């Protein structure tokens, strides 16, 4: 499974982690300023990302990525037919079937979600998009379900993976998405919601300034 993932995905992978992505984004900001380039970021957030994975679409994605059929069958048997009950102050609910999402606490779940996220990115044709950063051949950084889109132009909105995300059961959480721009940009309206534009931003638990400086004092 790891072979299907690009270098920009750093979550749940040996030798990669949040600190690498934080260092990468700080370096990108500083380099664009050094070369006097504009830089625009959009921090994508999904609503209940791991809980909304459509099982049937996940099996199809794994098949298209070349995962052997017997392994897909094992994963299907593991995920399907699961039941849960909710404990409340008034007692417990009736048992109900879990029809979506990857299993909480399962060591395979992060890998499965990474593959789903990779499918969204591939189908969004980001590699073919003209937007991106020219001093480095990159237009996104990823950590699990957290995706950061980046470009030198104002056409950041053209990189959004909204349609492809919805095809696999994931919905953009407009209220938690943020834009930061080192250059002119107007606010976005998506599905009736406004994406907030900010100067400093929280990236993987660390606050990064508009100059690309990392403010210590926040814990990862």
Regions flagged by a language model, labelled:
Residues 1-220:
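Nucleotidyl polymerases of mobile genetic elements and RNA viruses
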